[in-house]
Regions:
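Histidine-acidic metal/acid-base catalytic patches
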Residues: 23, 49-68, 74-182
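Aromatic-lined carbohydrate-recognition surfaces of secreted/lumenal glycan-active proteins
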Residues: 34-47, 68
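A structural signal for alpha-helical segments
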Residues: 13, 17, 39-40, 47, ...
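Structural motif corresponding to the early beta-alpha repeats
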Residues: 1-24, 31-35, 72, 129, ...
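Residue-level detector of transmembrane insertion/anchoring sites
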Residues: 29-30, 59
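Surface-exposed cleft-lining segments at the edges of enzyme active sites
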Residues: 7-13, 38-41, 104-107
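Alpha-helix N-cap/loop-to-helix initiation residues
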Residues: 11, 44-45, 76
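Short, conserved structural micro-motifs that define repeat-unit consensus positions
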Residues: 1-5, 41, 95
Length: 182
């Protein structure tokens, strides 16, 4: 779930309203024995790790936990290692996709600036047993030819439109390569 979209630069103006509404959601989830997973989506209260931590401090427990999305943090200008350190005790679900800080383009896991391999390693070393959800938002993937050459080549590479199957296969293969190196 997302918290709420907030006009840019207005987090403090809407903070109380966001927390009131999120509290209502968490109360409902608690009453119905459900778990809400909050994602760090761009443009919401909670796109940056600091706001996610504030939400976790207020509501984290059996019925409210965090989703960690590497690409969304990169696209929001958030250092993912810093985000992980702030949120590691609340992460229950991981969206596996990466992004380039230079332009925000989504790329296969490990090919961007999200520190995916390092953070996955830390998660597993800390006993993470949650899900890894592939998010192959790669249908208009720039840099297909640069996959073997690294992220600089990807940023400058050709564009190829991928089918859903191709995008999922690429996302899956990229994750497997990272996991095999651990």
């Amino acid at each position: 779930m997302f918290s709420f979209y907030i006009p840019e630069g207005k987090n403090e103006v809407y903070r109380a309203q966001v927390f009131d509404r999120m509290g209502q959601f968490v109360d409902y989830a608690t009453a119905n024995d459900a778990v809400l997973l909050h994602e760090n989506e761009k443009g919401i209260y909670g796109e940056k790790a600091k706001e996610c931590r504030e939400l976790m401090d207020a509501f984290s427990g059996e019925h409210f936990k965090a989703i960690f999305d590497f690409a969304n943090f990169v696209q929001a200008g958030q250092d993912t290692l810093e985000a992980y350190e702030l949120l590691k005790d609340s992460i229950a679900y991981v969206h596996v996709k990466d992004a380039l800080a230079a332009n925000g383009n989504v790329v296969p896991a490990g090919m961007g600036d999200g520190n995916v391999a390092d953070i996955l390693k830390r998660l597993f070393e800390n006993g993470y047993e949650g899900f890894l959800s592939l998010e192959p938002h790669l249908f208009n993937f720039s840099g297909f030819a640069g996959l073997e050459k690294g992220k600089d080549a990807i940023a400058e590479g050709e564009t190829k439109v991928l089918s859903g199957f191709e995008a999922f296969s690429l996302a899956h293969e990229s994750l497997l390569r990272l996991l095999e190196k651990m």
